[in-house]
From Swiss-Prot:
GO terms for cellular component: ribonucleoprotein complex; ribosome. It comes from Verminephrobacter eiseniae (strain EF01-2). Keywords: Ribonucleoprotein, Ribosomal protein, RNA-binding, rRNA-binding. This is Small ribosomal subunit protein uS8. PANTHER family: 40S RIBOSOMAL PROTEIN S15A (PTHR11758). It comes from the Bacteria. The keyword Oxidoreductase does not apply. Part of the 30S ribosomal subunit. Contacts proteins S5 and S12. GO terms for biological process: translation. One of the primary rRNA binding proteins, it binds directly to 16S rRNA central domain where it helps coordinate assembly of the platform of the 30S subunit. One of its GO terms (molecular function) is rRNA binding. PROSITE patterns: RIBOSOMAL_S8.
Length: 131
């Protein structure tokens, strides 16, 4: 059965794994998921990730990050979804927690944070908020 929202599945798997203090989480891989994982790594929300291929299926293994026994990601939520896409222009890209968190945005120039999208001067689809 096909998945209707693979990005929401990625975020939910990360959230659930952190609630039970798992060191890693495995999700089916795609280019967008790898780009989201790269943004999370660059922003310091995860320790790292790698793409593993077994029996022709590619999976993304994400190493979760904890500080003093608590997950670094306090909140991760989907914004744009298949039933209601959320697009913002370069001037309307939202800040998360007054700049303490990040909004992950997919733009014509790739997947990036809200700060980088504003600095680059591009808008796009707001995928999720991370804090």
């Amino acid at each position: 059965m096909s998945m209707s929202d693979p990005i929401a599945d990625l975020l939910t798997r990360i959230r659930n794994a952190q609630m039970v203090a798992k060191p890693t989480v495995m999700v089916p891989s795609s280019k967008v998921k790898v780009a989201i994982a790269q943004v999370l790594k660059d922003e310091g929300y995860i320790d790292g990730f790698q793409v593993k291929t077994e029996a022709g299926k590619s999976e993304l293994e994400i190493a979760l990050k904890y500080y003093a026994g608590r997950p670094v990601i306090e909140r991760i939520e989907r914004v744009s979804r298949p039933g209601l896409r959320v697009y913002k222009g370069r001037d309307a890209i939202p800040q998360v927690m007054n700049g303490l968190g990040v909004a992950i945005v997919t733009t014509p120039k790739g997947v990036m944070t809200d700060r980088k999208a504003r600095a680059t001067g591009v808008g796009g689809e707001v995928l999720c908020y991370v804090a």
